[in-house]
Amino acid sequence: MTTQNPVYASQAKPWLKYYDQKFIDQTLPALSAFEYVCQRSKNHLNDTALEYYGRKFTYADLIVNVKKTAAALRGAGVKKGDIITVVSIMTPEIIALFYAADMMGATLNLVDPRYSVEGIREYIEEVDSHLLVCLNVVYDRCSQAARRTNVEKVIVLSPADSLPPAMAAGYKLTSPDKNKYASNVIRWKKFMAGGKDQSTAAEPYDPDHACVVVHTGGTTGSPKGVMLTDDCFNGIALQFQAYPKLFHRGQKLMNVMPPFIAYGFACGIHLPLVLGFTVIIIPNLDPAKLGSLVLKHKPEHMFGVPTHYQQLASDPKLRDKDLSFITNYAAGGDSLSRGAEQTVNDFLAAHGARYPIAKGYGMTEVSSAATVAAGLDNKPGSVGIPMVHTVVAAFE
């Protein structure tokens, strides 16, 4: 009598029946994250890539800004292999900085601006940064954190740097910058001017290059820094192309997630730019205004946490509104109870949305999602099926 070896799901991959063969056969491009955005947008350079408080940046604008920022980094002494610590919310400058560091072989160490002086210092020392980039509103904490570290220069940016002119003037009147800056501080505009005579050449693609260091939430232990490569970011963007009924060039995604988590940058910025979306940047979300923002911008897509969608479902401003533009509003980053999921799904259906709330399961180490429940392949209480090039297995 012979005993057959069991065929494990991780070998048989039964979830592939949900995907078209052309997506199963796709291979990861040997490109940096920035090169992938450039390749995908080369015939759509006049499309809008980013929108920030009404100011729009085309894909051509984005690419030019990235190259200018790379030149400025070289002017500030940044070299291939350097790790730059960034303490900021999401702004157009941070997006350009991410791709600029990526194209020149450097890495961003993304830190939550709410951290204490000691917390920021710990993350600076962890990667031995010589350059620190921070938001002006957290400069005081960052300058204290940088003491007794190897930080030589501090680049300071303002949320107003990319605002439309009238709005920027109003912001500076209502929120004047009262910081007393040290001699090693360079303001963003001066930093950019320092790249005038510097190279904008890109380093060759390196499969081992880490484009970011992000820090885990400590769910399975103490928080730790995770290095994510270009392939990690591009892998997420490639796999989401396997949902052609949901994702189309020219759609809008409202980004409400911060840059210092993998979910925020991989799904909230890189993924939509690779797919040809317009990313509407909401840098510091007031949850009470989420419903108004959805009505104003009418984004087909949003990546958020469960509480965002519970907030929408209970918002009286949305009570009689048509939300049929909603295509894929996805919840991640926290657990979603069956009751809360049903409440949100009832709300979406009552307001004309075609699909229930999308869900996923993953971790920082996989750049966010490993499994996805989206569109009509979405069972209540389930975290979905593995993404097309992801292998999932259960271990005791």
List the model feature ranges, each with a label.
Residues Y52-F57, T69-Y115, V127, N136, ...:
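Conserved AMP-binding/adenylate-forming
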Residues M1-F57, D61-A76, D161-K180, S292:
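N-lobe entry segment of adenylate-forming
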Residues E300-G304, A313-N378, V391:
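Gly/Ser/Thr-rich phosphate-binding loop
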Residues I63-K68, A193-Q198, P207, V226-F247, ...:
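Conserved structural elements of the adenylate-forming
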Residues T58-A60, A202, C211-G235, A373:
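Conserved AMP-binding A3 loop
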Residues K178-H215, S222, K245-K252:
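Conserved pre-ATP/AMP-binding loop-to-beta segment of ANL
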Residues N234-K252, F260-F303, Q311, D315:
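Conserved AMP-binding/adenylation subdomain of ANL enzymes
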Residues G75-A76, M103-K190:
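Structural core segment of the AMP-binding/adenylate-forming
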